[in-house]
From Swiss-Prot:
F-type ATPases have 2 components, CF(1) - the catalytic core - and CF(0) - the membrane proton channel. CF(1) has five subunits: alpha(3), beta(3), gamma(1), delta(1), epsilon(1). CF(0) has three main subunits: a, b and c. Keywords: ATP synthesis, Cell inner membrane, Cell membrane, CF(1), Hydrogen ion transport, Ion transport, Membrane, Transport. This is ATP synthase epsilon chain. Produces ATP from ADP in the presence of a proton gradient across the membrane. The gene is atpC.
Length: 138
């Protein structure tokens, strides 16, 4: 089974969200989308706001929202250390839509680089949450 799966842990400051065997995962790294499969080369990279798509050994998919963090791939398994991590089914669509609206308003009214950068980061997080909600409903 070691050739067809690997151990994944997804943890945030608040809690452990996932701890088990998976076929593969997909996550948004600092340089783009990453697909991690069994026997992947060791890697340490930053994670952008987005999601981790977990494909369990049963073939079932689970989507987890990540606000950012670190991905560590080792021969013994993979660890996602997230700033914030929320299961797709636990996300609140109304709150995500409101966050998106507020961030868009902030971008329109921003007067400096710092305001714009912060609003852009908040917009990216809101869009990522909405994407996870959409994928979870499939």
């Amino acid at each position: 089974m070691a050739d067809t799966s690997f151990h994944l842990k997804v943890v945030s400051a608040e809690k452990h969200l996932y701890d088990g065997e998976v076929k593969h995962i997909q996550v948004t790294g600092s340089e783009g989308e990453l697909g991690i499969y069994p026997q992947h080369t060791p890697l340490l990279t930053a994670i952008k706001p987005g999601m981790v798509r977990v494909v369990k050994t049963s073939g079932e998919e689970e989507f987890i929202y990540l606000s950012g963090g670190i991905l560590e791939v080792q021969p013994t398994g993979v660890i996602v250390l997230a700033d914030t991590a929320i299961r797709g089914r636990d996300l609140d669509e109304a709150k995500a839509l409101e966050s998106k609206r507020k961030a868009e308003e902030h971008i329109q009214s921003s007067h400096g680089d710092v305001d714009y950068a912060q609003a852009s980061a908040e917009l990216a997080k809101a869009i990522a949450k909405l994407r996870v909600i959409e994928l979870t409903r499939r």
